[in-house]
Regions:
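Acidic, metal-coordinating catalytic segment for phosphate/diphosphate chemistry
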Residues: 136-241
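Short hydrophobic alpha-helical segments that form membrane-spanning helices or hydrophobic packing faces
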Residues: 17-23, 51-52, 211-217, 222
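DNA-contacting surface of Y-family translesion DNA polymerases
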Residues: 18-161
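Short, small-residue-biased leader/transition segments that mark boundaries at the very start
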Residues: 1-5
Length: 241
């Protein structure tokens, strides 16, 4: 596999492929011979994961054929095409990521009860924060709103931001029943669910960019990312250790 193009390796998406190319890494063999610490400094934890895969290392337990690992969470992150310097920038990217996470949850028949964000600044300092939410959800607007709330409560803009992630965790199935308080707008949530389903269908038939939120037109560079198509649902078995 040493001469195989690196993009064929699991988890090497468009952005990661571009970063590796900056270091002259073109094949899986190049990646296997790279310095793991250098990869970590530029890709975070994913640097070690890619280095391990390129070298054939995988200590996850062997499973029988047709065994499916349970999905424990659905998340997505992106290194932005330019540094984020204000709340508006972050809001756009969080909505893009929330769209991909919510769509994956709906596709797999799940809702999340925890929303988590990750943030990395332009000096590569990173942190994660999460929030237990009132009602399980796979509604795009709700996940985005919670993610933005978490960000506002935890970042003071000491430095510009280079990378952002959103994750839905503590998953339950779509048929999960929970008591709704008297002040919750059930009709409003049902309308949002129908709207999300309609958007999913339009994008399935005509492509991701066939329908966009008005927010995305405020910055065409940041909104150019198709997070859902570049999204990989990570197998729980490898990352649970």
């Amino acid at each position: 596999l040493g001469d195989v193009y690196k993009r064929q390796l699991l988890y090497v998406g468009k952005n990661t492929n571009r970063k590796l190319a900056l270091f002259g890494i073109k094949t899986i063999g190049d990646l296997a011979r790279a310095d793991e610490e250098v990869l970590n400094s530029h890709l975070g934890k994913m640097g070690s994961i890619l280095w391990s895969f390129a070298n054939g290392y995988d200590d996850s337990p062997v499973k029988l054929e047709n065994t499916h690992a349970p999905i424990k969470s659905v998340g997505n992150s992106t290194t932005t095409p330019k540094d984020l310097v204000c709340d508006e920038d972050v809001k756009i990217v969080l909505y893009i990521l929330a769209e991909s996470v919510a769509a994956r949850l709906r596709e797999n028949g799940f809702q999340c009860r925890v929303v988590e964000i990750s943030v990395r600044d332009n000096e590569l300092f990173s942190f994660t924060r999460q929030k237990k939410i009132d009602h399980a959800t796979n509604i795009t607007g709700e996940i985005a709103a919670y993610a933005y709330q978490i960000f506002k409560e935890n970042y003071n803009w000491s430095k510009p931001i280079r990378s952002v992630g959103v994750r839905g965790a503590d998953l339950v199935t779509d048929n999960y029943w929970e008591q709704i308080d008297l002040f919750s707008s059930v009709e409003k949530r049902e309308k949002q669910m129908k709207m999300d389903s309609a958007v999913d269908e339009i994008r399935r038939r005509f492509g991701f960019y066939s329908i966009q939120r008005g927010l995305m037109y405020r910055d065409r560079i940041l909104s150019a990312v198709n997070a859902k198509e570049e999204h990989t649902v990570h197998p729980h078995g490898y990352f649970s250790g």
